[in-house]
Regions:
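Acidic/His-enriched low-complexity segments
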Residues: 1-199, 221, 226, 324-326, ...
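Hydrophobic alpha-helical and helix-loop surface patches within well-folded domains
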Residues: 3, 13, 24, 127, ...
């Protein structure tokens, strides 16, 4: 980002700031010519960013016939799109507005509030204010997207979006999302915490999927299936990935880790929960056998000199990125599965529900989960 100017308004008085960049630690310092009075203040920042090509921040797809843009902010790339407190433990409500070509569909975390009239081929889409979210969970996608049928679970509408021409391939994903959401609401004992649930298929994506609140992004090869041509393994992978991302709506989004050293708690829980959900929906798939196979892969990774603790000390953005691996996901899920078997399924579920209720719309650490399980 290029920060052009900044000012703070306190009690109706505006104070201009000097901007001091610290690229080595990816922070910025705003200096004022006098001490600001205690109390609420409004910080206004003028900035300019760029659309990237490396699947980070706000980036463009490679398909020049159907141009599109999307965001990928996890773990530490929100700061490449807009100035923010880019830490998981700091949450805010966001008012997102996007100006784009009038013919394009614009998607974000919240439902559309209004769209302006097209002027010179562009229009602005304004979204409703989000609930409290960490910056890395904000999502925007712009392009020639279309959706098919809508599923409804409780008050939550579910849609699958893909580039034009791929709409029939989202049928299985829509069914899997609805079946997962039904079971997750029952397990957590509370409804889905966001106003909608969009599943968005992107041809170019850094991960298999990303659990942005209310607008989950997927690599299209993971989300979209030709049911006549796909294998049982393909369907299992799609269902498991969807269940994993939807589990994050509660464990990760509604309650977020306070810092990246507890990333394992988010990812291992979603991994474990996805297997529980898919097994309950399709027991004939015997998905726990797949879990055993993945655990062996985690064992092999854990035996290397480069292994790390499940909960390592994270001090930099690079260290946060390095922990998205099988140790965090699968070894952590194995630990949680052992814990669930030790305390009992009912006690474990009760403890997690307590943890979610205590810390909803906030951040928590592993110790908070252990306290809820006592």
């Amino acid at each position: 980002l290029v920060l052009k100017s900044a000012s703070a308004t306190v009690d109706g008085v505006e104070h201009n700031a000097t901007i001091e960049m610290h690229p080595e630690c990816e922070t910025v310092l705003f200096r004022f010519d006098r001490a600001l009075a205690k109390g609420q203040l409004s910080l206004r920042i003028s900035f300019k960013g760029r659309v990237r090509d490396d699947l980070r921040g706000m980036y463009r797809g490679r398909d020049r016939k159907q141009p599109w843009l999307a965001s990928q902010l996890c773990p530490t790339d929100a700061r490449r799109v807009f100035p923010c407190f880019d830490e998981p433990g700091i949450k805010a409500r966001y008012n997102v507005s996007v100006t784009a070509p009038a013919e394009d569909v614009v998607l974000s975390n919240a439902p559309v509030q209004k769209r302006s009239r097209a002027v010179a081929g562009s229009r602005t889409t304004h979204f409703e204010q989000t609930p409290l979210l960490s910056a890395y969970l904000i999502a925007v996608a712009v392009g020639p997207f279309e959706s098919g049928q809508t599923a409804q679970v409780g008050k939550t509408p579910i849609r699958v979006y893909s580039l034009k021409g791929q709409r029939p391939l989202g049928k299985f994903a829509l069914e899997a999302a609805a079946e997962s959401l039904i079971r997750l609401e029952k397990w957590f004992g509370m409804p889905h915490p966001y106003a909608k649930l969009d599943l968005v298929a992107l041809p170019d994506f850094a991960f298999g999927a990303m659990e942005n609140a209310g607008a989950v992004f997927f690599r299209d090869s993971v989300l979209l299936l030709d049911e006549k041509e796909s294998s049982p393994e393909d369907r299992l992978r799609t269902a498991e990935t969807i269940a994993h991302e939807l589990a994050h709506m509660w464990f990760g989004n509604l309650v977020t880790m306070a810092w990246w050293n507890d990333l394992w708690l988010n990812e291992s829980f979603a991994t474990w929960m996805a297997y529980e959900i898919v097994h309950d929906w399709k027991p004939e798939w015997r998905i726990w056998l797949e879990f055993v196979a993945r655990r062996e892969n985690a064992f092999e990774l854990d035996a290397l000199a480069s292994s790390h603790p499940i909960a390592p000390q994270v001090k930099t953005a690079d260290e946060a990125n390095e922990n998205f691996d099988a140790i965090t996901y699968t070894k952590g899920a194995s630990v949680l599965r052992m814990l669930e078997r030790y305390v009992g399924a009912s006690a474990f579920r009760k403890g997690v529900r307590t943890y979610i209720r205590r810390h909803r719309n906030a951040a928590a650490a592993a110790g908070d989960l252990w306290a809820a399980l006592e």
